[in-house]
Amino acid sequence: MAALISLFFLFVTLFHDLADGRGLAGTSHDKVIVCYVSRWSVYRPGAGSFDIFDIEPSLCTHLIYCFVGLDENSFKITNIDAFQDLETDNGKGGFKRIVALKEKHKHLKVSVGIGGWNEGSAKYSKMAADPKLRNIFIRSVMNFLEAYKFDGLDLNWDYPTQRGGKPEDRKNYVHLIRELSEAFEPYGFLLTAALRPGKDDMDTVYDLTHVNYYLDFMIIMTYDYHGAWDGVVGANAPIRGQHKDDIYSIEYTVNYLLNHGLTPSKMVFGLPMYGRTYSFNTRGVKDIIFGETTTKTTGFQGPFSKEDGFMGYNEICLEITNKSSLYTQHWEEHTSTPYIRDDEHFITYDNPRSIANKVKYAMDRGFGGFSAWSIVTDDFRGSCDEEPDTYKDYIERFNKISDQNLLKDALISLTEGEGGNQFYVISDKKVRLRLPKPSYANYPLLRTVNEAIFLATEEKKVLDEMEKIKTQRRNELEKGSSPCVRTCTEVCYYGL
């Protein structure tokens, strides 16, 4: 009887996972999807409270549990919130619970993140400067990873050379990651790090050549370019800057890193699951101009996160869904940024459409994957209305393809060679773009990341095939133009 009961519950669990569109195998693309899980979000009120059981592992390839810290006396890795992290004294056992997700989701890797803003920089600077302290730290990390069965360490030292750090941190950071890498390699542990995107940081904080060499992958924090601290409105994560010399944009960061030799496949593109809030200096501002419209230098709080200048997407989308809200939705085309505003407030954020565009941007540049900071502020409960324009820009690019015959030939060629396309299809003798359809409501941003990877991959494949066919036909025409006499069939086939 006990065996039958166990079998029944196993069937129910599997049926639930499959029925709501979520499987156990994880993502079926080849990109890294790093999902940061910020432990402190469990303390947020009401629907903003996030626990480990809210994670949807099928949408991630890697989880990073944030954060643990550095003991400033022993210089060993240590937990920060014993009640949430450990099982002792009736604790919630966060370490064990998040690692246990690997048992059911075999594709998953789970790392622990060390550092973060509240940890500061001074004690990390001191540890990295001293070979003996580095050795103590690294040995403690090895023991920690083995004891709790984590797969690796994500280094979030905020930040070398700053906030109590020293200029020598740039050199000592390399010593630290080199020695960590050498210690990790025999055991297969992952070593990753989150890197700031600003030009000053990239110039003075990181020795990019060595960072690129020693880290398994680099998580580029392509967000927080602008906020209320600027005193004017701006996009949190603009793809393009406001002018050609603007260094505060994703485009500038990515070009800088690629020009300095970073390996694209080791770069992970950071995606913010949140927005930045502003309050106007005076009520009733009519026209918003990014980089010019003035604001107070402290933003307002959201109802769940309760942090000045910050609102999670799960808070913002509730305002959009609320029919009585005074906020109106807008789109800033140049930076590819959504924003909402009323007479007093302004919020720049990322929604499914801007996320889909960023996925396309990073895929075109060969990035190895994407990170979500943090999944706890996605609409993980599925409380909000589905946004209707997620793939608007993909549709517009599709509609701009003028040579439909060439497009059809490319699809036929791909179908014959690879077994068909999922999104670019021929139906009723017409080429159509079939967009991904959500099978469940929660995690709209994280779902979009995964969906857009497939869509962007197929778009590039189709365009490449069109260019290949066009080149082949041009070459054949040039070869056959003289002295061969071409037949009507050939001329018609080539569309002349």
Give the residues covered by each predicted segment.
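Conserved, mostly hydrophobic/aromatic
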Residues: 63, 112, 155, 180, ...
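Non-catalytic positions within long, well-ordered alpha-helices that form the structural scaffold/packing
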Residues: 56, 146, 211, 258, ...
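Glycan-recognition patch characteristic of GH18 chitinases/ENGases
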Residues: 20-145, 171, 396-398, 404-478
